[in-house]
């Protein structure tokens, strides 16, 4: 980065910090597209396997302890959960239903696929999807399926590694390289990934800045 680019990046990080330090509120849960809020502000969606740490990351991102409920039952969230950021509202975060739940009946899985596919293809204010991948496991076949769905919908997405504090540095380096390689094979994936730990607050500043940049871009 040039000194000018570095200064601009630091300014973006500070703007994002101030934004998320302000108003962040749960708006609604939408079990079907007809319940979505009016498409009047930019939206950033969060996707990931069940138990990937999505709720914990949303809580860390917003600086709240229990904004997004952490469920002990994987695959429990089968709705699009909306959170508003800013006063007045500058953007909305969309917590998408988790995928890859082994015990879900086929009907539930099909309902999930239809809801997510139709949301991705038809939501004009959706600026970016953040695809969360567990650092301990790397990209799984179900993650590949989600990437394919995003590619087909033409929705740009960033890959975010979660729980980076749970593995050794050498293992993290390996899974990061493998994830970058997987992203570069995809048409709609952002080529750089963000490595995070909700528990250690690692990468949270960068993630906030990315969310703000994507929403306003």
Curated annotation (Swiss-Prot):
<comment type="function">
    <text>Necessary for normal cell division and for the maintenance of normal septation.</text>
</comment>
<keyword id="KW-0547">Nucleotide-binding</keyword>
<keyword id="KW-0717">Septation</keyword>
<feature type="binding site">
    <location>
        <begin position="196"/>
        <end position="198"/>
    </location>
    <ligand>
        <name>GTP</name>
    </ligand>
</feature>
<feature type="binding site">
    <location>
        <position position="55"/>
    </location>
    <ligand>
        <name>Mg(2+)</name>
    </ligand>
</feature>
<protein>
    <recommendedName>
        <fullName>Probable GTP-binding protein EngB</fullName>
    </recommendedName>
</protein>
<feature type="binding site">
    <location>
        <begin position="95"/>
        <end position="98"/>
    </location>
    <ligand>
        <name>GTP</name>
    </ligand>
</feature>
<dbReference type="InterPro" id="IPR030393">
    <property type="entry name" value="G_ENGB_dom"/>
</dbReference>
<keyword id="KW-0131">Cell cycle</keyword>
<dbReference type="InterPro" id="IPR006073">
    <property type="entry name" value="GTP-bd"/>
</dbReference>
<keyword id="KW-0132">Cell division</keyword>
<dbReference type="GO" id="GO:0005525">
    <property type="term" value="F:GTP binding"/>
</dbReference>
<keyword id="KW-0342">GTP-binding</keyword>
<dbReference type="GO" id="GO:0000917">
    <property type="term" value="P:division septum assembly"/>
</dbReference>
<dbReference type="GO" id="GO:0005829">
    <property type="term" value="C:cytosol"/>
</dbReference>
<feature type="binding site">
    <location>
        <begin position="48"/>
        <end position="55"/>
    </location>
    <ligand>
        <name>GTP</name>
    </ligand>
</feature>
<dbReference type="GO" id="GO:0046872">
    <property type="term" value="F:metal ion binding"/>
</dbReference>
<comment type="similarity">
    <text>Belongs to the TRAFAC class TrmE-Era-EngA-EngB-Septin-like GTPase superfamily. EngB GTPase family.</text>
</comment>
<feature type="binding site">
    <location>
        <position position="77"/>
    </location>
    <ligand>
        <name>Mg(2+)</name>
    </ligand>
</feature>
<keyword id="KW-0460">Magnesium</keyword>
<keyword id="KW-0479">Metal-binding</keyword>
<feature type="binding site">
    <location>
        <begin position="75"/>
        <end position="79"/>
    </location>
    <ligand>
        <name>GTP</name>
    </ligand>
</feature>
<dbReference type="InterPro" id="IPR019987">
    <property type="entry name" value="GTP-bd_ribosome_bio_YsxC"/>
</dbReference>
<feature type="domain" description="EngB-type G">
    <location>
        <begin position="40"/>
        <end position="217"/>
    </location>
</feature>
<dbReference type="InterPro" id="IPR027417">
    <property type="entry name" value="P-loop_NTPase"/>
</dbReference>
<feature type="binding site">
    <location>
        <begin position="162"/>
        <end position="165"/>
    </location>
    <ligand>
        <name>GTP</name>
    </ligand>
</feature>
<dbReference type="InterPro" id="IPR005225">
    <property type="entry name" value="Small_GTP-bd"/>
</dbReference>
<dbReference type="Pfam" id="PF01926">
    <property type="entry name" value="MMR_HSR1"/>
</dbReference>
């Amino acid at each position: 980065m040039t000194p000018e680019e570095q200064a601009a990046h630091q300014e973006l990080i500070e703007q994002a910090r101030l934004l998320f330090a302000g108003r962040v509120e749960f708006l609604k849960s939408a079990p079907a597209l007809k319940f979505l809020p009016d498409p009047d502000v930019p939206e950033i969606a969060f996707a990931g396997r069940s138990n990937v740490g999505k709720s914990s990351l949303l809580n860390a991102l917003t600086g709240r302890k229990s904004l997004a409920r952490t469920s002990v039952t994987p695959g429990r969230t089968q709705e699009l959960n909306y959170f508003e950021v800013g006063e007045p509202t500058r953007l909305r975060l969309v917590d998408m239903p988790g995928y890859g739940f082994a015990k879900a009946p086929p009907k539930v899985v099909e309902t999930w696929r239809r809801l997510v596919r139709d949301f991705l293809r038809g939501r004009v204010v959706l600026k970016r999807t953040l695809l969360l991948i567990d650092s301990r496991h790397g990209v799984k076949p179900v993650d590949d399926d989600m990437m394919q769905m995003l590619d087909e919908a033409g929705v740009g997405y960033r890959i975010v590694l979660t729980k980076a504090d749970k593995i050794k540095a050498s293992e993290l380096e390996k899974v990061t390289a493998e994830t970058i390689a997987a992203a570069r094979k995809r048409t709609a994936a952002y080529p750089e990934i963000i490595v995070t730990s909700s528990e250690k607050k690692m990468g949270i500043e960068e993630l906030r800045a990315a969310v703000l940049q994507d929403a306003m871009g």
